[in-house]
């Protein structure tokens, strides 16, 4: 659904219509789903449970009725209203975090007598009140002073309820009868210091001594510390987060220390292995307070308050699933607003106590009239708080988002990176030319880079060339390893990255772009999504419990199974094996047939599974455009190899050998089915009619054929979902091991042609050069089979004689090839279509065979072995001459090579365990955490070394052949990944708002038309963000960047500063480094350099900021105070750059902030 913004863009001037249309397409391509949710679907119900009076409903929004005119009692006279107004207008001095006028109802004036009249009046409670009360209170004992937060799911009618039960220590029934009003007054009078003539002192005493009288036992939590110093001791994670053992950060000086430490501590504080740690929240200090410090237990009445927020869901199941997904993934935000609602109710209780105390003592009014007046006031205030909650939640759920954030789209591995860079540079140029007034864009970017600090880890050096860093977005090896050893919630890490909460002291930042020009605001939002960074998250589903949990990027990962072999786009080459789970894996295709071998010596079918050997990135790219590959197929235990140690065959002097160190995708059976029931899988080659095997080979369970793949298939003509479709089917009668593939492939088949390079052409030419005399293989060195490939469409039952063994190279007869498939690669083949095929390995005296690797877009044909009418007598005779000792000797030789520790079942009668060394070890880069701001990696150089434990297998004595056989490759448990569409359960996309009709406090980035509401609620929002942080950790400061395109100003509002002179915040000091960054990038683009190069230059300049911050941190190490002029003379750092560099340095050197601020 397109937002009205895009419709308005069409009416703009023709000069910018082209670029605006491009921007419109950028946002609409991955458009965010705009659900519908009505505020009336949110219901609030409040209970109290008192020891003496039991449980009763204080408020139920579904049982209220609005009244137009209410006759106010004479007892609620104007004088009384003035008293109420006078009390409620009082504010605490110094700390704005507990401002009553903002938290209760900042939109109304308490001095206005008319507004004190109730607008709503309660009616009879709803029928489900008792049931909901039982659900909310549950079995929580009255003696428990803490708070409980629960989620309830009601099936009929479909509802979700979020409830919070906490202890109220006021000792009075504020909303009910006034029988305990005197108790509450006595309770307040216990503290003689709070009752002074100064009403502001009264309010301060109540809020400070009651609400925050007993903070949690954590150092530096005092509320009276200097919050204006810029360095709050409560912001130091190292001193606040309790850990049962020393933190690794004490000696961890690497550049990613802050990001690493933050995740490590999160793992410790959320792991049950280390005990249960209390969650951090300011309001918990009120609930967890100690009775010993307060008045005597005889006066304090234990009372529990329960707040329930009920979300009425739609009858549409899809809508319900969407909301459930959003609710549970964004639960920290819901909980934060729930706490804000709870605080409003608590503060209202305190205000009513004070007002009733003064009214009761001054006017001597009756209890009944006081009861009526307090009920009316409380009811209206709760309704106001509920309306604010409803509006916030509905806006959070329904407001438009930016369809394709620049950084996240680059992270997603999209093949259109060139186009994406081109679009980004177009928008960048437009903004530099149209938003340069008053240095608006440099000031805005300075503020963003200073506060949204998640960009810092993305530019940290990792030893890779800049082009690879830019194109592949490497991940942090240390953070990846941490995610496996100390798991944490990736959504929590992503949320912290978005808010920029990785520095020290910890700050939460958000950006609001204000302006009436929709197109300009939209462009600025799109531009900023490149600098406000976070990691991309991808939800994965595992077949079974495993240690590794691969998280890979959307749009680049597919899954396929052995039955259907469906393959989608991916950037990874992974192989996993798992048990047969019919509910997760597709059913077997009817087209897949398992032909039996008709060889006279082969008494049983042969089962083949797959092991894709690791190949380098360059080889995978080369293979995408290579028409011919040689595929080595072997049986269940090993590939047949005969070493060149003089053991020659007496009959024809040939020894069968296969290449062990070739960089090909090899077929290795895992022995999931019994050796008496082997089935040879079908492949794209027409081989002999009968399989050949002698008795010794049959005993050893080994056999091999040397096969080559037809070059006549054009890779671009085959869609990805057809690849491997019929290559390796499973037998329906056998409970065989299932194989899951994540095959490397590009997003679009057409891009395969573009990826072809000169290196690929040279590689093809080298492998297809005509054979020479030196390349001839002697009889005791090599044995090769000449095979004739028939047309793909030929029936699988057609007989074809197996060619005789020759000592020269094989040649292919392409007569039956498809002419269209051959046309693409005519230039790379000889006239007769022949190509040399070498099957030598790297044993002593042998030359390593250079075999091309095939990728997923190189399709297999349909058959590997077919029945024939003419038995392959030559091969059968040849195989009979091979002794079993040769295989054992060959494997002994191969044990000296580079290996992957994968043991393959041998299955021979001596139960001899054999080891296969398949060539090149993998370096598959897995962004295991993928939830750092460090990006994702698609290069083998970025992957870390993984320890691959051996999986032992015993062939002859294995009873349960249906047992799972694990090959512990990275990501082996991954079977399903979400679609390419933007996920609603992703903070990275859901909190980057578009042009909104109203201010949304939770959005990290958003655009609005006017700052009227922003001025109205910004102070309370920032205060709430500090008091109830969504990250569940102490926050020193909350800031908001306000960029006004109408006035061309950029200001930063802070929770530590009040608005002065009607200004929302403090003006931003433009950094000269940022200004130079923007202008140098613009000049490069104007000089017709490629957009990719310009974006790379932008990254280099950002990395320069990081290096300067490292230089600053090293200079400040060990110093107490330093002057700005000294930094300019010694380090060449200008005063305008110091705030930015200090913020960047705080991400890796926390002591910098303590020295400079």
UniProtKB/Swiss-Prot annotation:
Domain dDENN FNIP1/2-type: 1093-1148
Signal peptide: none
Gene Ontology BP annotations: negative regulation of lysosome organization; positive regulation of TOR signaling; positive regulation of TORC1 signaling
Pfam families linked to this entry: FNIP_C (PF14638), FNIP_M (PF14637), FNIP_N (PF14636)
Gene Ontology cellular-component terms listed: cytoplasm; cytosol; lysosomal membrane
Domain uDENN FNIP1/2-type, chain residue ranges per copy: 37-467
PROSITE patterns found in the cross-reference section: DENN_FNIP12
Function: Binding partner of the GTPase-activating protein FLCN: involved in the cellular response to amino acid availability by regulating the non-canonical mTORC1 signaling cascade controlling the MiT/TFE factors TFEB and TFE3. Required to promote FLCN recruitment to lysosomes and interaction with Rag GTPases, leading to activation of the non-canonical mTORC1 signaling.
Protein name from the UniProt record: Folliculin-interacting protein 1
Organism of this sequence: Gallus gallus (Chicken)
Gene: FNIP1
């Amino acid at each position: 659904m397109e937002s009205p913004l895009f419709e308005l863009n069409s009416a703009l001037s023709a000069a910018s219509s082209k670029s605006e249309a491009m921007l419109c397409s950028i946002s609409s391509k991955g458009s965010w789903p705009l659900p519908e949710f009505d505020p009336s679907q949110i219901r609030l119900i409040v209970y109290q449970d008192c020891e003496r009076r039991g449980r009763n409903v204080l408020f139920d929004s579904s049982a209220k009725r609005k009244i137009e005119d209410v006759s106010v009692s004479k007892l609620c006279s104007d004088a009384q209203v003035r008293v109420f107004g006078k009390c409620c207008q009082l504010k605490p001095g110094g700390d704005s975090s507990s401002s009553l006028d903002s938290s209760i109802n900042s939109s109304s004036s308490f001095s206005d007598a008319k507004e004190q009249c109730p607008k709503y009046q309660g009616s009879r409670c709803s029928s489900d009140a008792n049931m909901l009360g039982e659900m909310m209170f549950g079995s929580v004992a009255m003696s428990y002073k803490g708070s409980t937060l629960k989620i309830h799911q009601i099936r009929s009618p479909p509802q979700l309820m979020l409830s919070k039960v906490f202890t109220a220590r006021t000792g009075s029934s504020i909303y009910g009868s006034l029988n305990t009003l005197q108790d509450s007054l006595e309770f307040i009078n216990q503290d003689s210091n709070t009752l002074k003539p100064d009403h502001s002192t009264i309010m301060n005493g109540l809020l400070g001594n009651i609400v925050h009288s007993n903070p949690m036992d954590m150092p530096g939590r005092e509320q009276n510390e200097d919050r204006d110093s810029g360095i709050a001791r409560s912001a130091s994670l190292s001193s606040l987060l309790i850990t049962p053992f020393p933190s690794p950060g004490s000696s961890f000086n690497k550049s990613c220390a802050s990001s690493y430490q933050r995740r490590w501590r999160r793992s410790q504080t959320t792991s049950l292995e280390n005990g249960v740690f209390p969650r951090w929240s300011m309001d918990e200090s009120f609930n967890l307070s100690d009775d010993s410090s307060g008045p005597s237990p005889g006066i304090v009445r234990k009372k529990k308050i329960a707040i329930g927020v009920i979300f009425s869901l739609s009858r549409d199941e899809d809508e319900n699933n969407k909301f459930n997904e959003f609710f549970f993934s964004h639960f920290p935000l819901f909980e934060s607003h729930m706490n804000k609602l709870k605080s409003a109710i608590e503060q209202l209780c305190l205000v009513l106590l004070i007002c009733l105390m003064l009214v009761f003592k001054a006017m001597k009014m009756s209890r009944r009239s006081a009861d009526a007046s307090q009920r009316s006031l409380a009811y209206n205030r709760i309704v106001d708080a509920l309306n604010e909650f409803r509006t916030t939640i509905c806006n959070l759920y329904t407001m438009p988002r930016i369809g394709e954030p620049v950084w996240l789209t680059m992270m997603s591995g999209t093949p259109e990176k060139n186009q994406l860079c081109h679009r980004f540079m177009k928008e960048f140029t437009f903004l530099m030319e149209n938003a340069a007034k008053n240095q608006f864009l440099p000031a805005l970017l300075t503020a963003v880079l200073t506060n949204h600090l998640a960009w810092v880890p993305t530019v940290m050096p990792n030893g890779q060339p800049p082009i690879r860093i830019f194109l592949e977005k490497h991940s942090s090896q240390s953070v990846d390893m941490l995610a496996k050893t100390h798991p944490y919630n990736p959504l929590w890490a992503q949320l912290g990255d978005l808010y920029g909460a990785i520095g020290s002291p910890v700050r939460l930042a958000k950006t609001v772009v204000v302006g009436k020009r929709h197109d300009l605001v939209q462009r600025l939002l799109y531009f900023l999504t490149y600098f406000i960074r976070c990691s991309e998250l991808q939800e994965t589903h595992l077949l079974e419990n495993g240690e590794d949990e691969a998280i890979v990027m959307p749009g680049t990962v597919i899954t396929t199974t052995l039955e259907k072999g469906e393959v989608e786009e991916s950037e990874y080459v992974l192989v996993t094996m798992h048990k047969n789970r019919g509910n997760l894996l597709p059913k077997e295709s009817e087209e897949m047939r398992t032909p039996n071998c008709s060889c006279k010596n082969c008494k049983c079918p042969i089962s083949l599974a797959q092991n894709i050997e690791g190949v380098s990135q360059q080889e995978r790219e080369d293979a995408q455009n290579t028409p011919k590959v040689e595929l080595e197929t072997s049986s269940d235990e090993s590939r047949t190899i005969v070493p060149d140690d003089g053991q020659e065959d007496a009959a024809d002097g040939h020894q069968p050998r296969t290449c062990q160190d070739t960089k090909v995708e090899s077929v290795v059976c895992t022995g999931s089915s019994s050796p008496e029931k082997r089935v040879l899988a079908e492949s794209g080659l027409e081989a002999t009619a009968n399989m050949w095997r002698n008795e010794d080979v049959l005993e050893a369970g080994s056999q091999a054929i040397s096969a080559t793949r037809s070059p006549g298939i054009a890779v671009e003509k085959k869609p990805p979902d057809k690849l491997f479709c019929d290559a390796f089917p499973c037998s329906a009668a056998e409970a065989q091991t299932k194989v899951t593939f994540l095959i490397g492939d590009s997003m679009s088949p057409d891009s395969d042609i573009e990826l072809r390079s000169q290196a690929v052409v040279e590689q093809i030419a080298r492998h297809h050069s005509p054979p020479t005399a030196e390349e001839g293989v002697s009889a005791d060195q090599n044995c090769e089979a000449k095979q004739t490939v028939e047309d793909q469409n030929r029936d699988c039952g057609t007989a074809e004689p197996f060619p005789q063994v020759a000592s020269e190279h094989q040649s292919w007869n392409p007569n039956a090839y498809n002419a269209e498939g051959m046309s693409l690669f005519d230039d790379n083949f000889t006239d007769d279509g022949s190509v040399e095929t070498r099957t030598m390995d790297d044993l002593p005296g042998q030359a390593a065979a250079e075999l091309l690797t095939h990728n997923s877009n190189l399709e297999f044909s349909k058959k590997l072995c077919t029945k024939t009418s003419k038995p392959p007598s030559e091969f059968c005779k040849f195989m009979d001459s091979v002794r079993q000792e040769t295989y054992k000797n060959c494997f002994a030789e191969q044990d000296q090579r580079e290996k992957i520790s994968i043991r393959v079942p041998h299955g021979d009668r001596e139960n001899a365990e054999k080891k296969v060394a398949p060539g090149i070890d993998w370096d598959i880069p897995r962004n295991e955490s993928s939830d750092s701001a460090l990006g994702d990696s698609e290069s083998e150089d970025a992957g870390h070394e993984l320890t691959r434990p051996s999986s032992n297998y015993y062939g002859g004595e294995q009873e349960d052949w249906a047992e799972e056989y694990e090959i512990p490759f990275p990501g082996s448990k991954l079977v399903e990944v979400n679609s390419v569409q933007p996920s609603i359960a992703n903070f990275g996309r859901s909190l980057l708002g578009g042009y909104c009709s109203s201010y949304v406090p939770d959005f990290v980035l958003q655009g609005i038309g006017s700052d009227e509401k922003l001025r109205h609620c910004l102070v309370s929002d920032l205060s709430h963000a500090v008091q109830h942080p969504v990250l569940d950790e102490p926050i020193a400061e909350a800031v908001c960047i306000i960029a006004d395109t109408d006035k061309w100003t950029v200001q930063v509002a802070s929770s530590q500063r009040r608005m002065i002179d009607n200004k929302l915040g403090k003006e931003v000091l433009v950094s000269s480094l940022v200004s130079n960054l923007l202008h140098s990038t613009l000049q490069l683009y104007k000089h017709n350099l490629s957009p990719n190069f310009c974006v790379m230059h932008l990254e280099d300049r950002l990395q320069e900021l990081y290096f300067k911050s490292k230089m600053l941190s090293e200079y400040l190490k060990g110093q107490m105070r330093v002057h700005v002029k000294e930094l300019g003379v010694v380090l060449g750092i200008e005063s305008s750059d110091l705030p930015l560099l200090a913020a960047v340095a705080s991400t890796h050197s926390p002591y910098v902030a303590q020295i400079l601020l």
